[in-house]
Design a protein with these regions (language model features):
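Extracytoplasmic ligand-binding site segments that recognize negatively charged/polar headgroups
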Residues: 126-129, 145-158, 196-219, 266
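Bacterial Sec-exported substrate-binding components of ABC uptake systems
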Residues: 3, 15-65, 166-201, 318-325
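Sec-dependent signal peptide recognition
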Residues: 2-8
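A short, structured surface patch at a secondary-structure boundary
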Residues: 62-113, 117-123
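Proline-aspartate-enriched helix->loop->beta-strand connector
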Residues: 107-120, 139, 245-258
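Alpha-helical, coiled-coil/dimerization segments enriched in small aliphatic residues
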Residues: 84-87, 211-240
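Structured C-terminal subdomain patch of bacterial secreted/periplasmic proteins
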Residues: 153-154, 158-161, 167-170, 258-325
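Short helix-initiation/N-cap motifs at beta->coil->alpha
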Residues: 45-46, 97-107, 236-244
Length: 325
């Protein structure tokens, strides 16, 4: 189903790899699946630390996406960042503690929650800065990094090892992997039939900025790469620093994708509208002329979609194959 927004052109709002990261290959490999006598699970986290977890009862997550993964692994959360409620709509217990915004978490509130295990982000400076304090307090903490589906799958595997719910690893992990593999196979056939890969421009927009994103270290970029797309920001890195309409016109991508950052949806749409109005040459782009400019739903392409990763791939491939869902 399409939802139109008129901003000098129609942007369709859709509901909602192959590329290996060093983190996935080297820093989150499980060293020991399970010690049967102690139920202790030992693994290496994203900071290269050896972490041993023994049947935690009070788990806190410093990102909503990590809280979601823990739930998908059959666990419960006693404290998390506000996006666990606002973005992921998790069924947290009434007494769960809101630690605040992801970049402004309260260490005091975390201590109030009295966790025995904390899921933290190696990509978030504040999380990493808490490491020594948490270790000094005797609180077990593991750091993770998730940029694409394979990262998610590995974190889910570790979490289901800890919870003992390997059935949920099958349901929320391996089944999704099979779904994605089928979509990627379809994309290869699409490219073979077309004789060439589509070119794309990925733009992250908020109410105050619009920036180009390449294929690395972001959800949409990784998906587009896996589906065989050529992101013009990969070869024109200057676009990452300076969004030049002139350079975009020279590259003339087949598709343009906007993803929303932040919670101000109306402000984001207004900013996109103003960006287009200030650049009349925009209307000369092939993607615009062919109606291939899309505003993608935040929950599938800006946030970590976790068990909805397969759905996100399917909807994106639907656009690229002109069979939108």
């Amino acid at each position: 189903m399409r939802f139109g927004i008129l901003i000098l052109l129609t942007i369709f709002l859709i509901g909602c790899g192959n590329q290996h990261t060093q983190y996935r290959e080297t820093t989150i490999q499980t060293i020991e699946e399970q010690n049967e006598e102690t139920e202790e699970h030992v693994f290496t986290d994203a900071l290269g630390r050896t972490v041993a977890v023994n049947n935690p009862k009070r788990v806190a997550a410093l990102l909503g996406s990590f809280a979601d993964i823990w739930y998908l692994a059959g666990g419960e959360i006693i404290a998390s960042a506000d996006d666990a409620w606002d973005d992921f709509k998790l069924p947290l217990p009434e007494d769960a503690i809101n630690l605040g915004m992801t970049k402004e978490l309260s260490l005091e509130k975390l201590f109030e929650a009295n966790p025995d295990f904390v899921l933290a982000s190696s990509n978030t400076k504040g999380n990493v800065e808490w490491l020594e304090t948490l270790e000094a307090a005797g609180i077990n903490v593991a750091y993770f990094e998730v940029n694409d589906f394979q990262d998610y799958l590995e974190v889910l595997r570790i979490c289901t090892d800890i919870t003992g719910r390997k059935d949920l690893y099958e349901k929320n992990g391996l089944a999704i992997q099979e779904q994605i593999e089928n979509v990627i196979a379809q994309s290869k056939q699409r490219i073979e039939n077309a004789g060439q890969a589509p070119t794309v421009l990925s733009l992250r927009a908020s109410s105050t900025f619009i920036r180009a994103k390449n294929s690395k270290d972001n959800v949409l970029g990784e998906m587009l790469f896996a589906l065989g797309c050529e992101n013009i920001a990969d070869s024109e890195e200057s676009l990452l620093e300076n969004l030049s309409i002139e350079q975009i016109i020279i590259q003339d991508p087949d598709y343009i994708f906007f993803i929303q950052q932040g919670d101000n949806e109306d402000g984001t749409k207004e900013n996109i509208k103003n960006f287009i109005a200030e650049n009349p040459a925009w209307s000369e782009l092939t993607a615009v002329k062919n109606g291939r400019v899309y505003l993608l739903e935040k929950s599938l392409y800006a946030l970590k979609p976790n068990d909805r990763w397969g759905e996100a791939y399917e909807k994106l491939e639907g656009i690229l194959s002109n069979e939108e869902m």
